[in-house]
Amino acid sequence: MSYLSKKKFSRYHLNNLKFIFKREDTGKFFIQDKFQGQCLDSESLISTFIVREKIKQYDIYTNILNWQFMSLNPYLMGSPKPIKRTSKYINLASDGSNIAEYLLNIYKLDQNVFEGIVETLKYILPYTRDLQVEETLELGRNVYIELTESNFKLPAWLLSTGTLRILALLAVLRHPKPAPLIVIEEIENGLDPRSVDLIVDEIRKLVETETTQVIITTHSPYLLDLLHLSQIILVERDEGQPIFSRPADQESLQEWSKKFGPGKLYTMSRLSQKG
């Protein structure tokens, strides 16, 4: 691998075809013009069409790699963690354990986005004064979150589980380069109804950009009432096998949905096809 004018050149072998990608500063990949349509070993020629098809396959692969899955573990989120970043953009670990490094990465990418996250956190938690990502050089480079309340500074391991969860959700949903797909497990865990309402609103704003799809799982009737019936997919088990259905497609629910919200229908067992 070599570098020239801040451009990275890499050789890739796909189906025995060898060619060179050029990676721009934007992260986009292109075929280096000098080699476009020609095998490096001169064994044969490859068409531009084939090359472009390989690039499409690579784009799909990188898109999948950037999918964001979240099943947060506040205990791991509160502990100092070593910096492991190897690229310009990083994903939040599914358990949220690298939240400090993830926030530090956001700060470096776009300071305004970071400050917006802090301001929203202040709105949710009025006692918050500031948020910092602290770095320690003892026993290696470790980073951790520190929250300022009045005149007290609290490290992440002293913060509530709800605070850590809200912070992780805001960071992922406000990221300057949001993931193409975000999947959040039991999003309401540790959150009060007011915070759930705000997070759902954040999801709506992100989805409206049409750059990201968000899938959440929940057992909360309150959260379901914040959604339209058409946005809900019910998962049930039938003889041990998962069954997926859209309650909005049930004709028997049309009249019920005029009187009750999805959350109430859920508690009444009306969303189920068995109901």
Tell what function each PLM region has.
Residues 175-177, 208:
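Phosphate-binding P-loop
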Residues 1-119, 123:
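Electropositive, glycine-dotted interaction segments
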Residues 1, 5, 30, 166-172, ...:
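Phosphate-binding glycine-rich loops of NTP-binding sites
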Residues 68-71, 129-132, 233:
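Residues embedded in well-ordered beta-strands within globular domains across many folds
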Residues 115, 119-174, 181, 187-194, ...:
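Conserved ABC ATPase signature
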Residues 9, 151-154, 242:
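Short, mixed charged/polar active-site loops
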Residues 179-181, 213:
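Residue-level preference for the first positions of well-ordered beta-strands
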Residues 198-275:
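C-terminal lobe/lid and adjacent interdomain/linker elements of RecA-like ASCE P-loop ATPase modules
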